[in-house]
């Protein structure tokens, strides 16, 4: 059980790092991008174009793209897929997914370092919370694929690894919850069985044994005793 929760915490920590990287793509930094296409570099909060002097010219930072957006040099947005620009508004699921994953990591750490790890209720809540976390990670990856198709860069592909990692954590949390519930049920059953047994003191057992031994030597009288017993007749003289 201890090793399993350690694995969950480790995987969630790695997943959190994977989900942070898309948030620091262009134009936040100029070294990472979700996708690159024809000198266009796309990030979570905008997009950039590399000019003739190899300098990136970016749009203002905001979630989602706009067909009227232009960079500082007047370039117009061009997506690598045929998706409508309005789909880019779904990129908002990235920070939401990061918040859920971070919360799930905190819950896993609490389970690992506190006695709440033996609580079926706490494990049930954490396992249930992992379900929307997994769905949000999966939605992030699907949105990235829908927008950028085969032009997805490695920070975007990390969302696939994050989705698989959260799926493994979700499965292990449900297994942990099942194991703890079974152990608690078996403990309650053993306590109930012990309480239902009659308890005798040593003196009571000894007294009962003595009564049993003495009764073995007692012979109950029968109706034949009167036939076997001799009759004594007094014969005398009457003066």
Swiss-Prot record:
Superkingdom of origin: Eukaryota
Membrane topology, Extracellular segments: 25-90, 150-155
Protein topology in the membrane: Multi-pass membrane protein
Transmembrane segments: 4-24, 91-111, 129-149, 156-176
Intracellular or extracellular location(s): Cell membrane
GO cellular component terms, A-Z: cell division site; fungal-type vacuole lumen; growing cell tip; plasma membrane
Keyword Membrane: yes
Sorted UniProt keywords: Cell membrane, Membrane, Transmembrane, Transmembrane helix
Record's keyword annotation contains Transmembrane helix: yes
Stretches assigned to the Cytoplasmic side: 1-3, 112-128, 177-239
Family membership noted in the UniProt record: Belongs to the palI/RIM9 family.
Function summary: Required for the proteolytic cleavage of the transcriptional repressor RIM101 in response to alkaline ambient pH, which is necessary for sporulation and invasive growth.
Protein name (record): pH-response regulator protein palI/RIM9
Source species of the chain: Saccharomyces cerevisiae (strain ATCC 204508 / S288c)
Classification of source organism: Eukaryota, Fungi, Dikarya, Ascomycota, Saccharomycotina
């Amino acid at each position: 059980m201890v090793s399993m929760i350690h694995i969950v915490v480790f995987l969630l920590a790695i997943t959190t790092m994977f989900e942070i990287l898309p948030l620091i793509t262009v134009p936040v930094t100029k070294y990472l991008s979700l996708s690159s296409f024809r000198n266009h570099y796309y990030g979570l909060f905008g997009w950039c174009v590399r000019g003739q002097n190899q300098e990136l010219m970016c749009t203002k930072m905001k979630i989602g793209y706009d067909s009227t957006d232009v960079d500082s040099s007047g370039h117009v947005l061009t997506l690598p897929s045929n998706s409508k620009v309005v789909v880019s508004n779904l990129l908002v699921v990235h920070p939401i997914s990061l918040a859920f994953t971070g919360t799930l990591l905190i819950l896993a750490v609490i389970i690992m370092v506190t006695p709440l790890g033996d609580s079926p209720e706490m494990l049930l809540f954490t396992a249930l919370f992992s379900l929307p976390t997994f769905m949000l990670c999966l939605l992030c990856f699907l949105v990235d694929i829908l927008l950028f198709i085969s032009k997805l860069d490695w920070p975007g592909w990390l969302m696939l690894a994050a989705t698989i990692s959260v799926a493994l954590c979700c499965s292990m949390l449900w297994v942990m919850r099942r194991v703890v519930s079974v152990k608690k049920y078996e403990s309650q059953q053993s306590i109930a069985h012990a309480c239902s047994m009659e308890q005798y003191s040593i003196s009571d057992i000894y007294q009962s044994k003595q009564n049993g031994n003495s009764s073995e030597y007692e012979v109950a009288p029968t109706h034949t005793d009167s036939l076997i017993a001799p009759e004594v007749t007094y014969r005398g003289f009457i003066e």
